[in-house]
């Protein structure tokens, strides 16, 4: 039946997420570093996800005029961003979803973010949103592990992850990673 197919997919996703988390934490997750043009990467994420975001939601990308290059694991960045964008899409019914990045030349960090005008997160729940099995809404699909996996990946990339949210107004999920290994463009 269709219901059992949905259940099977959710169970498989949960198992895969748990396996992914244990791989990361045991040190068995591999990271593959390469030079990444962040503008091209944001363009790619934008094109991929623009097909999944409902037409009534404005989808915006915000990048600096000049391309910026960092040495990182592009697949892991995409994994985090996909999680952020999927969550924004689940909880935003009108307004916009914005993805982009900013460079902080004083700290040698890149901050990558997704901002939305979704329902926001209640203040009392905000300290626990990056923990395992956190789900804002038990009726919305998902395992509650995506943000925990994202947090673990960001930690392995020597960065920080967080969220700023106002209930009823929206959220901004962000992570920062150092770019010192790639240097600044001339």
Each model region followed by its residue ranges:
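Short, small-residue-biased leader/transition segments that mark boundaries at the very start
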Residues: 1-7, 145
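Coiled-coil phosphoacceptor/dimerization helix of two-component systems
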Residues: 10-21, 41, 84
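Helix-loop junction within the histidine kinase core
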Residues: 22-33
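Conserved catalytic submotifs in the C-terminal HATPase_c
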Residues: 32-36, 54, 58-68
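Short conserved segment of the HATPase_c
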Residues: 121-133
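Short alpha-helical Gxxx[C/S/T] motif in the catalytic ATP-binding
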Residues: 146, 150
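Glycine-rich ATP-binding loops of the HATPase_c
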Residues: 158-164
């Amino acid at each position: 039946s269709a219901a059992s197919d949905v259940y099977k997919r959710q169970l498989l996703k949960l198992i895969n997420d748990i396996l992914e988390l244990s791989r990361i934490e045991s040190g068995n997750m591999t990271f593959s570093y390469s030079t990444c043009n962040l503008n091209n990467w944001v363009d790619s994420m934008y094109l991929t996800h623009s097909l999944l975001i409902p037409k009534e939601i404005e989808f915006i990308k915000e990048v600096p005029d000049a391309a910026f290059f960092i040495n990182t694991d592009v697949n892991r960045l995409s994994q985090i961003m996909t999680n952020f964008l999927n969550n924004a899409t689940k909880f935003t019914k009108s307004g916009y979803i914005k993805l982009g990045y900013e460079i902080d030349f004083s700290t040698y960090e890149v901050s990558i973010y997704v901002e939305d005008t979704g329902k926001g997160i209640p203040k009392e729940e905000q300290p626990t949103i990056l923990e395992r099995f956190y789900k804002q809404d038990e009726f919305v699909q998902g395992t509650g592990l995506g943000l925990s996996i994202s947090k673990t990946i960001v930690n392995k990339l020597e960065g920080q992850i967080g969220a700023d949210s106002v209930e009823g107004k929206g959220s901004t999920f962000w992570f920062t990673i150092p770019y010192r290994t790639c240097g600044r463009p001339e």
